[in-house]
Amino acid sequence: LLARENFKRAGVDKLVTLIVGDAHEKVKMLKGPIDIVFIDADKDGYLDYLNKLLPLVRPGGLILAHNTTDVGSQMQDYLEAITTNPELETIFLHEQTTGIGVTLKKRLAK
C-alpha cells in the first residue's frame, strides 16, 4: 500500500496503525484513546465514522477528513456535525480543490 510506504519513508511506520478493509466494520473493532484519525473513505459514511470514532478520540485529538469541501458533497450531515458540536473545533484547509477538514476534540474544562 502506498500509505504504508509513505509512513515508512517518513519514519513513523512504528507509530501509525494502518487499518485496511471495510471501514464500517473495522472501525467497530478499534479501542481508544486515539490521537489522530484520517478519514478517506466513502463520503456517505463519514458521519457514521465520526459517531463511532469520536468517543475513542482523546481530548486534544484530531480528526482529519479528506474531500470535505467538495462542491455538491454528499457529506452535509458530517459537515453539520463537526461544525455545530460544541466539543469540536473545525477548520478547513484548501490545499486541494476538495479540501481537508481538520477537527479538534476540545479538552474538557477543569
Regions found by a protein language model. Give the residues of each.
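S-adenosylmethionine/decaboxylated-SAM
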Residues: 1-110
